[in-house]
């Protein structure tokens, strides 16, 4: 939970709106990432709809046994996303899945682009 709070605080700091895992479960979702972004962000050129936070190190065995299937379910339901393994990621895994960005820290502000939200009246609001 500590790392989830760090993630949520980082998202608030950049002005991102999001639903938490608790919010998603209240909507009836069973398998959920830690946050679903209400408006996607771009991180290093990749569109991110959801973020999961792991208080662990990711090596090929950990990724295959516990992450790979779980993240595919999130991609199928919510679109592409990002997983933060706070204790590191083996470099070879960072580009394994084009729909799941694996990182070891919340991205720096310079690597994040806030995407526009389109309002019902046709106007858009940049964040």
What kind of region is each of these model predictions?
Residues 1-26:
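Acidic-basic catalytic patches of nuclease active cores, encompassing PD-(D/E)XK
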Residues 11, 33-60:
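Conserved catalytic cores of phosphodiester-cleaving nucleases, focusing on short active-site segments
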Residues 15, 22, 39, 55-57, ...:
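Short, flexible loop/turn elements at secondary-structure junctions
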């Amino acid at each position: 939970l500590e790392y989830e709070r760090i993630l949520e605080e980082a998202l608030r700091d950049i002005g991102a709106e999001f639903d938490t895992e608790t919010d998603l479960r209240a909507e009836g979702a069973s398998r959920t990432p830690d946050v679903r972004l209400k408006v996607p962000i771009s991180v290093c050129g990749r569109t991110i709809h959801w973020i999961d936070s792991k208080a662990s190190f990711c090596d090929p065995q950990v990724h295959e046994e516990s992450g790979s299937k779980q993240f595919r379910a999130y991609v199928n339901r919510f679109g592409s996303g990002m997983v933060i393994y706070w204790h590191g990621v083996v470099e070879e895994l960072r580009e394994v899945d084009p729909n799941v960005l694996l990182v070891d820290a919340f991205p720096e502000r310079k690597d994040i682009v806030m995407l526009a939200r389109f309002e019902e009246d046709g106007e858009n609001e940049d964040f």
